[in-house]
C-alpha cells in the first residue's frame, strides 16, 4: 500500500491510500518520494497549494463583497450568489460549498506538507514550510470571519470552524471533533501566522507568502480581535499596531503615488510596491468565456466580455463625491477622489445631457431618474424636461432647476412620484446607459491587470490596509494623533487637500470606517468590517434588494451557514449556525 499526498478533500483533509496502483492521481505525490528528496518535490507540492487558492478566491470575493454596500445588482438572480446579496441564508449553496471545499483543500495540502517535512534542512525548505503555515492560518481566518461570529461577541462560546490539520493516522477509524470556538480558531490562526513569520526568510514577490504577508495578516487578525470603538479590547489593539509597525517599518513595501493609484488594477503585482500578498492569476488562466465568469466579469463588460450586471452603489458613489464631484465625462474628466477612477459609467453615444438624481418611487423603493436638460442663451441649465405618455397622448413636463453648486453642476429639482413631491439634488451629466432601470456604473477594480480584460489577481494584503489597520487600532487606544497621521496618509494620497484637521472620540469611528470603505472597496472586506465593529449594514439606495432592510451585527445572518453537504459528509458532529436570532450568543 503506497501512502500518497492528494489534492482532494471531502469534509476533512484525507490522506488516501492506493493498493496495487503504481500510477498516482493527478496532483499527488508519494510520501517517500517527498521525504527522500524534499527540495526536488517542493515546487510541485507548493504549486498544488497555491492552485487551491485560485479557485477558492472566487467564492471568497463574492461572500465578502456581495454582502456589503459598495455594489448593487441589476435585478434578482437565480445564481447562488444572490443569497449573499439578499441575506437569504441557506445551507445549500454551491458557491458557499466551493468556498468551504477549496479552502479546506488548501488547508489539507498545507498541513500534509508541514507533517512530511522537517524544519532546519535548508532555508528554502523552511521558507516553504512557512508559506504552508501562512496559507493555513490565512484560510482559517477567512473561514472564521465568514462562519463564526464577530470576535467581540462571546468568542469562547460561539463556534468557529473545525480545526483539521492534516490527515489522521488511522483513516479507517476517524472521529473528528466538532467546530472549535471562535477563540480557539483565532488561536490556531495566530499560531500558524507566527510560525510562518518565524520560518520565512525569502521574499519571492507578492504572488507568494512571505514574512511581510504573515505580519500583515497578523495586523488584521488582531484588529478583528480589538473590540469595537465603544468597547475596545486593549489587549489586542496594541498587537495590531505592533504588527502594522513591522510591515510599514520594514521598508519592503511602499505606497504608490496618486497617479499610480488611479491605475492600480492595471499594475501587475510583481511591479507593484504596495502589494504584499495576492492570489496570482495569469493570462493563460483567463481565455474566452472565462472572462465572463471571473469576479470582474460581473462588474463590467470589457472588450465584449463580461456580464456587467453589478454596479457601484449610489451609497459608494456618494462617498466618493463627498469632498467634491467626480466627473467621468470625457470632455470634463476630473477625479477629486483618485479611487473614483475604478468606476466607469457607460455613457451612450452620441452624448445626451441630463440631470440625474434619485427619488423615492414609493415608501420602500428608491430609483434613479435621468431627465434632459435645457440651457438658456447664456448656457446656464434652467430646466429639465420629461415626456410622459398616457394612452396615445404624449405630454412634456418641465421642471425648474436651481443651482446648488453651479461650478460642480449640482442642481436641485422638485419631482413628483406616487410617494409625493420631493426636492432633491442631482448632477448635470451625460446620459448613462440603463440595465433594466439602473445606470451602468461599471466597476473595474477587479479587471485590466496588465491587459484590457478581466484578468485580476485578488488582493489579500496591501500596504494601504496596514496603515488603516494601525489608524483604527490606535484610535481604539485613544492615540488619536497617531491615528490621524496614518488616516491622512491614505486619505491625502487619494484626495488632494482632503486630510482631516483633527480626530477624536466623537468622529474617529465614522472617519476611519469611511476611509476603509473607500480604500478597500471590492476587496471582499466591507461586510466583515461593518459587523466586527458592531455596526449595522444599511442599503438605502436603488437596487432590487430590500432597500429598507437593516442588518445589525447582532443578527443571526451576519454569518454564513455551514454547507449542508459538509455536515452530511463530516466524520463526526458538525454543528450548524443558528437559524434565527434566538440562537445567537452575544455575551
Language model: regions and residue ranges:
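Membrane-proximal, proline-rich intrinsically disordered regions
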Residues: 4, 19-64, 347, 385-386, ...
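Long, intrinsically disordered, low-complexity segments
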Residues: 18-19, 188, 273-275, 280-310, ...
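Aromatic-residue-lined binding/catalytic grooves and analogous aromatic/hydrophobic interfacial grooves
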Residues: 20-21, 194, 200, 212-261, ...
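Conserved, well-structured interaction surfaces
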Residues: 81-148, 176-184, 193-204, 453-458, ...
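Short coil/turn linking the two alpha-helices of tandem helical-hairpin repeats
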Residues: 121, 144-151, 204, 221-233, ...
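"A position-specific structural signal for the A-helix of alpha-solenoid helical repeats
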Residues: 128, 135, 142, 217, ...
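Flexible, polar/acidic helix-loop-strand segments at domain edges
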Residues: 327-461
Amino acid at each position: 500500500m503506497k501512502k500518497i499526498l492528494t489534492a482532494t478533500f471531502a469534509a476533512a483533509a484525507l490522506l488516501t491510500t492506493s493498493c496495487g496502483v503504481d500510477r498516482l492521481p493527478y496532483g499527488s505525490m508519494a510520501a517517500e518520494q517527498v521525504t527522500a528528496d524534499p527540495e526536488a518535490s517542493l515546487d510541485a507540492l507548493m504549486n498544488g497549494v497555491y492552485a487551491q487558492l485560485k479557485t477558492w478566491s472566487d467564492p471568497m470575493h463574492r461572500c465578502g463583497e456581495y454582502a456589503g454596500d459598495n455594489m448593487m445588482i441589476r435585478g434578482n438572480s437565480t445564481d447562488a450568489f444572490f443569497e449573499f446579496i439578499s441575506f437569504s441564508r441557506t445551507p445549500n449553496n454551491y458557491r458557499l460549498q466551493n468556498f468551504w471545499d477549496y479552502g479546506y483543500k488548501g488547508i489539507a495540502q498545507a498541513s500534509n506538507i508541514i507533517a512530511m517535512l522537517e524544519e532546519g534542512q535548508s532555508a528554502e525548505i523552511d521558507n516553504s514550510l512557512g508559506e504552508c503555515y501562512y496559507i493555513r492560518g490565512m484560510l482559517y481566518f477567512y473561514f472564521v470571519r465568514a462562519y463564526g461570529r464577530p470576535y467581540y461577541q462571546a468568542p469562547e462560546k460561539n463556534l468557529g470552524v473545525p480545526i483539521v490539520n492534516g490527515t489522521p493516522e488511522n483513516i479507517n477509524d476517524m472521529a473528528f471533533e466538532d467546530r472549535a470556538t471562535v477563540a480557539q480558531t483565532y488561536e490556531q490562526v495566530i499560531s500558524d501566522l507566527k510560525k510562518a513569520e518565524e520560518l520565512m526568510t525569502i521574499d519571492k514577490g507578492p504572488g507568494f507568502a512571505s514574512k511581510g504577508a504573515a505580519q500583515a495578516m497578523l495586523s488584521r487578525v488582531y484588529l478583528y480581535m480589538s473590540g469595537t470603538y465603544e468597547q475596545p479590547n486593549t489587549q489586542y489593539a496594541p498587537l495590531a499596531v505592533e504588527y502594522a509597525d513591522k510591515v510599514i517599518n520594514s521598508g519592503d513595501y511602499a505606497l504608490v503615488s496618486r497617479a499610480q493609484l488611479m491605475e492600480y488594477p492595471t499594475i501587475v503585482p510583481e511591479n507593484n510596491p504596495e502589494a504584499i500578498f495576492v492570489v496570482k492569476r495569469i493570462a493563460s488562466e483567463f481565455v474566452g468565456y472565462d472572462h465572463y465568469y471571473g469576479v470582474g466579469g460581473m462588474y463590467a463588460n470589457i472588450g465584449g466580455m463580461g456580464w456587467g450586471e453589478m454596479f457601484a452603489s449610489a451609497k459608494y458613489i456618494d462617498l466618493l463625491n463627498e469632498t467634491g464631484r467626480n466627473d467621468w465625462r470625457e470632455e470634463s474628466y476630473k477625479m477629486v477622489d483618485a479611487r473614483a477612477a475604478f468606476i466607469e459609467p457607460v455613457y451612450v453615444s452620441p452624448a445626451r445631457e441630463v440631470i440625474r438624481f434619485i427619488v423615492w418611487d414609493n415608501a420602500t423603493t428608491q430609483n434613479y431618474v435621468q431627465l434632459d436638460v435645457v440651457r438658456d442663451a447664456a448656457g446656464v441649465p434652467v430646466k429639465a424636461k420629461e415626456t410622459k405618455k398616457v394612452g396615445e397622448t404624449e405630454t412634456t413636463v418641465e421642471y425648474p432647476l436651481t443651482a446648488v453648486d453651479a461650478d460642480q453642476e449640482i442642481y436641485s429639482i422638485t419631482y413628483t412620484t406616487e410617494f409625493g413631491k420631493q426636492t432633491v439634488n442631482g448632477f448635470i451629466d451625460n446620459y448613462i446607459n440603463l440595465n433594466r432601470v439602473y445606470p451602468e456604473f461599471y466597476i473595474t477594480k477587479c479587471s485590466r491587470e496588465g491587459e484590457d480584460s478581466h484578468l485580476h489577481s485578488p488582493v489579500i494584503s496591501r500596504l494601504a490596509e496596514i496603515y488603516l489597520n494601525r489608524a483604527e487600532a490606535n484610535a481604539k487606544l485613544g492615540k488619536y494623533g497617531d491615528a490621524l497621521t496614518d488616516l491622512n496618509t491614505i486619505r491625502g494620497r487619494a484626495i488632494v487637500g482632503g486630510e482631516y484637521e483633527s480626530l477624536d472620540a466623537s468622529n474617529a469611528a465614522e472617519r476611519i470606517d469611511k476611509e476603509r470603505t473607500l480604500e478597500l472597496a471590492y476587496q471582499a472586506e466591507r461586510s466583515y468590517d461593518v459587523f466586527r465593529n458592531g455596526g449595522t449594514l444599511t442599503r438605502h439606495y436603488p437596487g432590487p434588494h430590500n432597500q429598507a432592510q437593516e442588518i445589525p451585527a447582532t443578527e443571526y445572518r451576519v454569518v454564513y451557514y455551514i454547507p449542508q453537504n459538509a455536515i452530511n459528509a463530516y466524520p463526526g458532529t458538525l454543528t450548524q449556525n443558528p437559524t434565527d436570532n434566538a440562537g445567537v450568543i452575544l455575551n
